């Protein structure tokens, strides 16, 4: 599959020497990926622990692993992210979109996500390509970590490769349907309430909630 991805990316006629180099590159990437699997398993175990500890409805970790759609999405993301780090084309996005179609959770493989990551319920969660998420972060359903705007080039096309999504520091909780846009920072230990639109930095430990309706 890695070889196929590399061939697809080249999209040109290949000489025998080209094919040999691509095959050697694919084999090395596969070896590097396999070597990383024990560490990936360790990281995924922290995600399972976070999901189990944070959900009183979870009876055991086996239930979390087998039944929770967020674990499927996070597992696919962690596989895809490592492949992307190894410069494997196309396949990482296919892997995360498979989880997206099955779970309703859209995590771009380019996002950087720390350990003990939890998504509760999960439907409608969107995590953009340049998002950075620290350790022990919990998101609820419908959360969007998105971009606020796209700088355009001289042809009015969006400029690619610019950091445009939020930075979420350690120990942050973001409740359902919160929308956080742009390259802003949500500080360590902050709590973002549900149904809130955030476009500015949030200080560490701050609690941001909707204003109470006036009588």
Placement of each model-derived feature along the sequence:
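Terminal amphipathic alpha-helical/low-complexity segments used for targeting or macromolecular assembly
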Residues: 1-94
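Structural signal for interior beta-strand "rungs" in well-ordered beta-sheet cores
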Residues: 99-215
């Amino acid at each position: 599959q890695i070889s196929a991805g590399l061939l697809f990316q080249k999209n040109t006629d290949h000489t025998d020497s080209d094919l040999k180099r691509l095959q050697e590159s694919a084999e090395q990437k596969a070896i590097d990926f396999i070597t990383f699997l024990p560490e990936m398993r360790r990281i995924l175990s922290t995600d399972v622990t976070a999901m189990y500890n944070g959900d009183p409805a979870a009876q055991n970790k086996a239930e979390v692993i087998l039944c929770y759609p967020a674990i499927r999405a996070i597992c696919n993301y962690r596989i895809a992210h490592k492949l992307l780090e190894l410069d494997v084309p196309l396949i990482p996005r296919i892997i995360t979109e498979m989880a997206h179609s099955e779970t309703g959770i859209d995590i771009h493989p380019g996002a950087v996500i720390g350990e003990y990551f939890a998504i509760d319920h999960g439907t409608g969660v969107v995590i953009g390509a340049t998002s950075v998420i620290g350790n022990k972060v919990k998101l609820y359903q419908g959360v969007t970590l998105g971009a606020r705007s796209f700088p355009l080039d001289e042809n009015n096309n969006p400029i690619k490769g610019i950091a445009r999504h939020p930075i979420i520091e350690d120990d942050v909780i973001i409740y359902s349907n919160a929308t956080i846009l742009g390259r802003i920072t949500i500080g360590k230990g902050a709590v973002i309430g549900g149904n809130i639109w955030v476009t500015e930095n949030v200080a560490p430990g701050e609690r941001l909630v909707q204003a109470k309706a006036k009588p």
